[in-house]
């Protein structure tokens, strides 16, 4: 319900504004304005139809509806940003006129030109975004870890975060992620939260757990909760994650081998999750300690407890500009490498790769 409320607020705030400005820009002809009106009516109707009947509709139908509505939702954000820039330009003209005379004399043509520039620009941006999502790449970062790891002088980890398996991210893309992971020949794979998006049925019905079982890592596959694991069908998500072949770490401490510790924290959204201090009782702090924590809020806590490396996801680096700028105001480190005292952190947007040594790490 929370997701729906957020989406419908955006629908009811952005769509009327876009419609109003677009309608003004179009020529006063039925052949232009009627299709424009129908587009907005159909999109909003499709959105409500998909939400109301989401549990009754076949998966392929609801997936199609989500593709259409999600694409328009993202496009509407960029259209709105473009229109707001134009509003500022119009305001500056009112304060101190500076538009050339030819523009004033052809104001309707100018608005129509800007209309098509925004449409084509946002369309190109959406095509680029789709290509980026559907063609994931591996991010490699080098990190130095000071502690010795016994007889082990190398450890390769693949970290995947924020898969958001659901209506949009499905079986084909997960198979790409698995193939990318196996191509790195990792010692260990970690799935750092938000494995599912909202409903669990899409992962269940497509048997995506069978694809995740194909992840190859001699030290195992480890999974932690993200905030999306607490949205809708929580128990079903827990049962499904247990079928993936990985080890689910919910406030748990394991030693994949005797040379280092791996601590998987429950998500920050669960206010009753255990403190890191309590989880580390009995942990030999002379060995490397790696903590998986979906949301990057606990840097100070990790630093105080002697953690060597914190691995996080969640932020998507804002994902859509200008959100990355806002993320920098919200998080101490919204993306990439960060060091606080002796503790090092990496916040991933999707796919990351680590190789640890006595004196170094490759992430």
Question: Where are the regions that the model predicts?
Answer:
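Non-catalytic terminal accessory segments
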Residues: 1-134
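A short C-terminal boundary segment appended to hydrolase-like catalytic domains
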Residues: 16, 47, 302-303, 355
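Extended active-site neighborhood of metal-dependent phosphoesterases/phosphodiesterases
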Residues: 128-130, 135, 139-145, 149, ...
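Membrane-embedded segments
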Residues: 134-137, 148-235
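Active-site metal-binding loops of divalent metal-dependent hydrolases
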Residues: 161-164, 193-195, 227-228, 252, ...
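Short, glycine/charged-enriched secondary-structure capping and boundary segments
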Residues: 172-175, 203-207, 236-239, 277, ...
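His/acidic metal-ligating clusters that form di-metal
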Residues: 180-188, 213-220, 244-325, 332-333, ...
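Conserved small/polar residues in nucleotide/adenosyl-binding loops
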Residues: 352-361
């Amino acid at each position: 319900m929370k997701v729906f409320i957020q989406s419908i607020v955006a629908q009811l705030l952005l769509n009327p504004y876009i419609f109003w400005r677009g309608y003004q820009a179009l020529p006063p002809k039925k052949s232009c304005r009627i299709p424009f009106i129908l587009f907005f009516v159909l999109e909003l109707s499709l959105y409500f139809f998909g939400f109301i009947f989401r549990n009754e509709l076949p998966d392929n139908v609801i997936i199609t509806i989500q593709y259409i509505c999600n694409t328009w939702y993202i496009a509407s954000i960029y259209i709105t940003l473009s229109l707001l820039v134009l509003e500022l330009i119009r305001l500056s003209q009112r304060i101190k006129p500076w538009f050339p005379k030819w523009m004033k004399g052809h104001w309707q043509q100018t608005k129509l030109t800007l209309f098509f520039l925004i449409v084509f620009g946002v369309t190109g941006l959406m095509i680029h975004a789709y290509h980026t999502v559907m063609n994931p790449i591996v991010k490699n970062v080098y990190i130095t870890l000071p502690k010795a790891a016994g007889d082990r002088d190398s450890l390769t980890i693949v970290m995947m975060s924020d898969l958001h398996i659901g209506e949009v991210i499905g079986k084909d893309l997960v198979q790409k992620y698995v193939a990318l992971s196996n191509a790195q020949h990792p010692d260990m794979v970690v799935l750092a939260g938000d494995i599912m998006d909202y409903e669990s049925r899409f992962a269940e019905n497509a048997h995506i757990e069978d694809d995740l079982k194909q992840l190859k890592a001699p030290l195992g596959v480890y999974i932690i909760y993200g905030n999306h694991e607490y949205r809708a069908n929580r128990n079903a998500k827990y049962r499904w994650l247990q079928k993936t072949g990985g080890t689910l770490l919910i406030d748990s401490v394991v030693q994949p081998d005797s040379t280092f510790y791996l601590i998987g924290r429950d998500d920050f959204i669960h206010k009753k999750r255990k403190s890191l201090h309590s989880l580390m009782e009995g942990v030999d702090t002379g060995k490397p300690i790696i903590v998986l924590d979906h949301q990057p809020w606990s840097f100070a806590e990790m630093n105080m407890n002697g953690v060597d490396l914190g691995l996080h996801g969640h932020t998507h680096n804002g994902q859509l500009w200008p959100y990355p700028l806002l993320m920098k105001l919200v998080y101490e480190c919204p993306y990439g490498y960060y060091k606080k005292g002796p503790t090092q952190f990496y916040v991933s947007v999707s796919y990351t790769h680590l190789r640890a040594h006595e004196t170094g790490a490759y992430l």
